[in-house]
Structure formats: structure tokens, C-alpha cells
């Protein structure tokens, strides 16, 4: 939003300094600062509210006996609200919303955020210990992976920016002259990567309730 506003002001009135908004580095830095401000101000309020509502992680006794889940008990859950807010608001404010990659990243983030929210909601509000059934979580991850992979593969013109054309070709690490074309298998590869990375964070969060390190990476 701010990107389009700055672009309009720059083209209409041509004030000095507004040309800086066209640089991704500037907008990335501005988005990072915005996210930091949101998390600093909103985070403590949400955490305090969750603690007041006694919304916390429940540790499994059998895992605590094995030395696992020792740090999980009482950790406020639904902290993903802070992460999602700090990601989505700066992205919408500073990113180029005409770029399909940006749109799809926001869609994927919001989609998986809804899956996570449903899981926590069922655990905390509905008092269902297992939350959202595992197969439904996987189904949600595979579903958004198929949407993302298929849209990129079947509509490559939407994802081609300037001289950078979309390609299913990839290079093999440490062998720059060795290329591999995924072809139609690009779609299941997108599904695999999205599901794997999503579950990597989910499993880490399930161990101690502290997934922010993995999310940051």
C-alpha cells in the first residue's frame, strides 16, 4: 500500500527522495523495522492476554519423564498471532502487491496460519488434547502446495519478472554446469518442500513450544 502511494506521489508530484521506494533494499529494511516495531509493541500485550486467559501449552507427562517437554509446560500458545501479524502487515504495506510471488507468499503464510490457529483453537478452546487431526494438517499443507506449484507451473507468465523468466530448471549444488529440469515434477517438489519445512517448524514447536528460532531461519 505504501509502495503504491509513494509511487503515485513520485509520478504525480516528483518530490525529491521518493524515488528510493522503488529499491527493494529500502523497502525490505523498512518492512523489517515495521515488523520489529509491531512485535515489540504487540507481542507483550498478546502474551500477557494469553497468560491472563491461562492459554498455555500442556506438556505430556510421558515425555517429561524422558526429559522432553520440560520447557513446554505453561508456554503461552497461539503465539503465531504475533508472528503472522509481524509478517503480513509489513508485507502488505511495503511489498509490490502486483508481484505474484509476493501475493502467493502472503497467501501461503495466511493459509498455514489458519491451519495453525485451528489446531490451537481446538486444543485450548474446545479442549481437544490432539487439536486438529494430523491428516487434516497434512491435507491443508498439501492443498496449498498444489495451488502454489500448479499456479507457477501452468501460468509461468504471471511469475516472469522483467528479463527473469520462470523455469523448472535447477542447478546441482557445487556443479554449476550440471542442470536438472523438474518438468511436471516441479509441482510435487513444491508440495514436498512446503510440507517438509512447515512440519519442521511444527515438530520443533511441539517439542518445547518455542519455534521462533526455526521460523527466523
Task: Locate predicted features.
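"…together with the soluble PPM/PP2C metallo-phosphatase catalytic core" -> "…together
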Residues: 2-217
